[in-house]
């Protein structure tokens, strides 16, 4: 993730949060650009990736000159941008009780992302 932010001279902070049912997930908060901290003048935006993905989807450098990833464009426009991750992807492999080797760790579905993961991040934002 760090290299994708560095390519665009953006600064960020990883933010760990724990869900009500014990999963610890790392998401990312865009904090600034080459000019310094971003002045937040607009609403917060939580960007949520698709199935099988992670938050890097919103900071990918697109082909061609002059293209800026959506997350960076929103941040530079004054939004407070948060890149959300869910349990089970590479940024959500921790649990209070279970390890990724335990069958119980993987006993979740998409409903859990909306019932537990997203509300836990919203509490942080």
Feature map (PLM): residue ranges:
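Intrinsically disordered, low-complexity regions
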Residues: 2-9, 35, 74, 105
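Amphipathic, alpha-helical segments enriched in basic
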Residues: 2-5, 96-100
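Short interface patches used for recognition in eukaryotic signaling and trafficking proteins
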Residues: 10-11, 56-58, 102-108
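Alpha/beta-hydrolase active-site loop
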Residues: 103-125
